[in-house]
């Protein structure tokens, strides 16, 4: 095994179970990512540059583009983990038919509610950290003069809907000082966007405004600005599965959603938003399709289209769109070594796979038709964990025979054939005539 795998730290069983079960099911684990992260140094370095900008009071907007299974969600979760460790608050949501950026039936508000439900900090990485953030702010205001609190909230009051938002913050602070749990929960309910009608909010809070489908993004900007008052560096918003906007059948509804993206893009790049970073993940089709994708909205296409100087070997990682490149053969080898160590530690067995076996496994994966352009880490990981499960449950199984039975021609030794010079196993497929 390589030094990377042999020196790997022991993974707690609970974390190992989440990693293995999530990856075998084709989804990204929300915990334990540092144990299995490989590659993506260039992309991660570019996104970490954005975090520095956010901490300085700026804002950023990025698209992560890659095929299904290429590692978009994995990279988003990796950045999420790193941002929380650096003192940022992270909110993430996956779009769906019920959750969009804009909709006539509350789909935009549903996305906001999902973001707030998943709001996370270093001490509450699993989400649901809104009350923790509010309580931290209340504690920071405990021994300061009221004029200091007013000065702290003054920049928020100048923002759109800032007066209503700061009024709720003051109400929460008063309720916390008086031990009024019911009033505190009502303010939390308001911030989460759970009041359905203005009359309901007026009856319980005396407020005639509620967070709605049209203005939820304004409150995201307010929350990002408020987080700095609570001692955090800023807010990172991660929105995945943009393909669900591409799938909207109604062209006008699609355009409204892309218009919302344009608003967010303009706000962050023009300096209208502060302490806020936005990262959206989507497939190449959902972004670049000129008929239904993001590029169908001309104002966005003209802003996001790649310039004339970037090319395949010279990527511009400071551009708004980051296109994920496939992991290299060597990076995948390191990844499956790490997975083998985690699997062995969790199930308490000694793998019989040698490094040559791991290389043979990757040869089989890369030996598929179309693997050069269509093989993704998700497929490699899923197959490898399945192989480990089989070997763990069948200790007498011969690894080489198992790989040979699946790989066949991919593992056949290259042999000169006298007429074509191709590998013997592939001779019948070297050429054909239609």
Predicted regions located by residue number:
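P-loop NTPase nucleotide-binding core
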Residues: 63-66, 70, 74-230, 391-395, ...
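C-terminal alpha-helical "lid" subdomain
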Residues: 174-190, 194, 311-315, 325-434
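Amphipathic alpha-helical segments in well-structured domains
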Residues: 44, 76, 108-112, 254, ...
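Conserved phosphate/pyrophosphate-binding and hydrolysis machinery centered on Walker-type P-loop NTPases
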Residues: 33, 37-41, 69, 105, ...
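A short, basic N-terminal segment
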Residues: 1-60, 397-434
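The catalytic "switch" region of P-loop NTPases
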Residues: 7-15, 190-355
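Short acidic (Asp/Glu) and glycine-rich catalytic loops that position anionic groups and cofactors
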Residues: 27, 90-96, 240-244, 313-319, ...
């Amino acid at each position: 095994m390589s030094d990377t795998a042999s020196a790997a730290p022991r993974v707690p069983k609970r974390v190992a179970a989440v990693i293995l079960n999530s990856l075998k099911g084709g989804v990204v684990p929300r915990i334990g990512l540092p144990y299995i992260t490989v590659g993506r140094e260039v992309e991660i370095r570019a996104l970490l540059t954005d975090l520095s900008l956010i901490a300085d009071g700026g804002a950023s907007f990025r698209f992560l583009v890659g095929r299904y299974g290429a590692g978009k969600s994995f990279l988003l979760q990796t950045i999420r983990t790193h941002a929380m460790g650096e003192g940022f608050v992270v909110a993430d949501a996956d779009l769906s038919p019920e959750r969009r950026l804009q909709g006539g039936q509350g789909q935009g508000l549903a996305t906001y509610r999902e973001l707030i439900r998943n709001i996370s900090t270093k001490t509450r990485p699993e989400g649901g950290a809104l009350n923790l953030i509010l309580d931290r702010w209340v504690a920071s205001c405990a021994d300061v003069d009221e004029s200091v609190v007013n000065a702290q909230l003054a920049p928020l009051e100048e923002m759109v809907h800032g007066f209503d938002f700061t009024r709720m913050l003051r109400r929460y602070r008063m309720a916390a000082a008086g031990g009024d749990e019911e009033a505190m929960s009502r303010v939390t309910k308001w911030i989460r966007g759970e009041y359905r009608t203005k009359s309901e909010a007026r009856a319980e809070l005396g407020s005639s405004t509620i967070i709605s489908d049209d203005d939820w993004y304004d409150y995201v900007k307010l929350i990002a600005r408020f987080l700095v008052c609570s001692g955090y560096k800023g807010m990172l918003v991660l929105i995945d599965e943009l393909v669900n906007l591409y799938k909207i059948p109604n062209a006008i509804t699609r355009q409204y959603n892309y218009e919302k993206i344009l608003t967010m893009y303009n706000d962050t790049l023009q300096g209208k938003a502060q302490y806020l970073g936005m990262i959206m993940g989507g497939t190449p089709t959902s972004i670049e399709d000129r008929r239904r994708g993001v590029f169908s909205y001309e104002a966005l296409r003209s802003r996001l289209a790649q310039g004339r100087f970037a090319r395949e070997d010279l990527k511009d990682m400071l551009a708004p769109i980051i296109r994920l490149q496939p992991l290299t053969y060597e990076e995948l080898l390191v990844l499956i070594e790490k997975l083998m160590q985690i699997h062995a530690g969790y199930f308490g067995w000694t793998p019989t796979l040698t490094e040559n076996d791991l290389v043979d496994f990757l040869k089989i994966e890369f030996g598929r038709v179309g693997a050069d352009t269509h093989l993704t880490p998700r497929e490699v990981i899923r197959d490898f964990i399945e192989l480990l499960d089989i070997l763990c449950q069948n200790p007498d199984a011969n690894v080489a025979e198992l790989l040979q039975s699946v790989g066949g021609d991919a593992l056949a030794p290259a042999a000169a054939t006298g007429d074509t010079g191709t590998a013997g196993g592939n001779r019948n497929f070297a050429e054909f005539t239609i």
